[in-house]
Amino acid sequence: MARHSIKMIALLTAFGLASAVMTVQAAERIAFIPKLVGVGFFTSGGNGAQEAGKALGIDVTYDGPTEPSVSGQVQLVNNFVNQGYDAIIVSAVSPDGLCPALKRAMQRGVKILTWDSDTKPECRSYYINQGTPKQLGSMLVEMAAHQVDKEKAKVAFFYSSPTVTDQNQWVKEAKAKISQEHPGWEIVTTQFGYNDATKSLQTAEGIIKAYPDLDAIIAPDANALPAAAQAAENLKRNNLAIVGFSTPNVMRPYVQRGTVKEFGLWDVVQQGKISVYVANALLKNMPMNVGDSLDIPGIGKVTVSPNSEQGYHYEAKGNGIVLLPERVIFNKNNIDKYDF
């Protein structure tokens, strides 16, 4: 009888130890979700996230929907929560569409962060932000102004969708800057490629054909910008200023051929790394309130800013924005220094 009791205690002890190990492993799993898979920009961000995971000894899973949809992202969020992931970092396709799922996840103790494209601030803890809407909207207009030296000009905006958070915030600021600083510029159209390469090319060609006297296309989207450049080449429009945001590896041939003089972005690999380091800080219960800083190896210090930096009115403890240290304008003189 005593021998049987000893065996039972040993089994229970072993089971308890195994459970503890499993719990530790589960607490070290982070999901990193893009708007969709198969786009170089998001893949690069995922690479940065997974590199940070390896450095920290954390299992980082990169996965996203094949199309940019709320339902696809919600399904992934729910799956990761049910699998016991401890943190989820998502580039949201909608500011509010993911909120019910994200709030449920937070109620279950999952740390929720956003990167690239934000939700409403009450639906996450921190947004790893490439730049404020004012910074990025100004950057778009300034790049166009470097090439459009006419007082009166015709400009088109072309990006992913009318509902995506980040790009619409940038475009709103860009249009306001045009109204204030370039009142002679006419915004002739705003169109969307819906993160589809084929549709983006068709839309870009349609814009150029519909407005033969167009002076500039502003395309703050990783699919729309190369599509606009390719459309200009297909239609032999050499005198069109094409600016926006995309990755240097995608845009390099257009810059080398002179179709695109300059375009902008930020180091998205760095953005992925910062996202995971911030999530890890939350998992380790490190102080992460407004004004607190985090030292990230190879990157430097990042600081938590209030949500008001993004134009929000919501502030709470353990909630804010972490801005990337810098943004980059790429041209033929510096593009070969970057590989992502």
UniProtKB/Swiss-Prot annotation:
Keywords: Periplasm, Signal. GO terms for cellular component: ATP-binding cassette (ABC) transporter complex; outer membrane-bounded periplasmic space. Its main location: periplasm. InterPro entries: Bact_Solute-Bind_Prot2, LsrB, Peripla_BP_I, SBP_2_dom. Gene3D superfamilies: 3.40.50.2300. It is found in: Periplasm. Part of the ABC transporter complex LsrABCD involved in autoinducer 2 (AI-2) import. Binds AI-2 and delivers it to the LsrC and LsrD permeases. This is Autoinducer 2-binding protein LsrB. The gene is lsrB.
